[in-house]
């Protein structure tokens, strides 16, 4: 299956955000730095939720290295990243775990909802731009208390990594992403 141009744009943005040191490659240290930043974004979240999210970042990085690091250099190029991340059979389990853990992190009360402040804090910690974050949250259809369902966000994260998807809420994250 050929990925949509929107899916390719989404994955290229994720690569740039995860490349924490800006050296053009993803390495275990990049995932550790990202994990630390995101876990710190919602201090009210419980330790078990924080640990789950940190573990999902480790699995995400470990999956990439296991699947792609053919030469054993401990790092992933943009081309290698695109080839596996847009392949649900090879990367789907890591995306599922990450989606569930990140969405749960935004629900420190455990009521099944993510309020805008927690959503924005987590997405800023990942490195997305605030206007894109706000547009995404609005696209998820917040309720009268300005909250979205945890399941809605988790499903949106899964869709973000689906190669056949276009015109999804997650596409708001790539609009003028480099501006």
Predicted regions and their residues:
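The feature marks the first
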Residues: 2-41
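Short helix-capping and inter-helix turn/linker motifs at the boundaries of alpha-helical repeat units
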Residues: 2-6, 55-56, 93-94, 126-128
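Primarily EF-hand calcium-binding motifs
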Residues: 8-23, 51-72, 97-111, 132-150, ...
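Amphipathic regulatory helices of Ca2+-sensor modules
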Residues: 27-45, 75-90, 113-127, 149-163
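General zinc-binding finger modules coordinated by cysteine/histidine
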Residues: 86, 92-94, 101
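Acidic/histidine-enriched, glycine/proline-rich intrinsically disordered or flexible terminal extensions
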Residues: 159-179
């Amino acid at each position: 299956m050929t990925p949509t141009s929107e899916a390719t744009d989404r994955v290229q943005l994720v690569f740039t955000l995860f490349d924490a040191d800006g050296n053009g490659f993803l390495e275990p240290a990049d995932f550790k730095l990202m994990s630390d930043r995101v876990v710190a974004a919602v201090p009210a979240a419980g330790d078990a939720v924080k640990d789950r999210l940190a573990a999902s970042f480790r699995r995400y990085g470990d999956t990439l290295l296991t699947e792609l690091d053919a030469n054993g250099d401990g790092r992933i190029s943009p081309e290698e990243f695109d080839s596996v991340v847009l392949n649900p059979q090879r990367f789907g389990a890591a995306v599922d775990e990450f989606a569930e853990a990140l969405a749960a992190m935004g629900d420190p009360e455990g009521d099944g909802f993510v309020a805008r402040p927690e959503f924005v804090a987590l997405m800023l910690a990942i490195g997305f731009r605030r206007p894109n974050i706000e547009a995404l949250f609005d696209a998820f259809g917040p309720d009268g208390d300005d909250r979205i369902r945890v399941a809605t966000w988790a499903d949106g994260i899964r869709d973000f990594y689906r190669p056949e998807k276009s015109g999804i809420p997650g596409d708001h994250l790539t609009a003028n992403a480099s501006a």
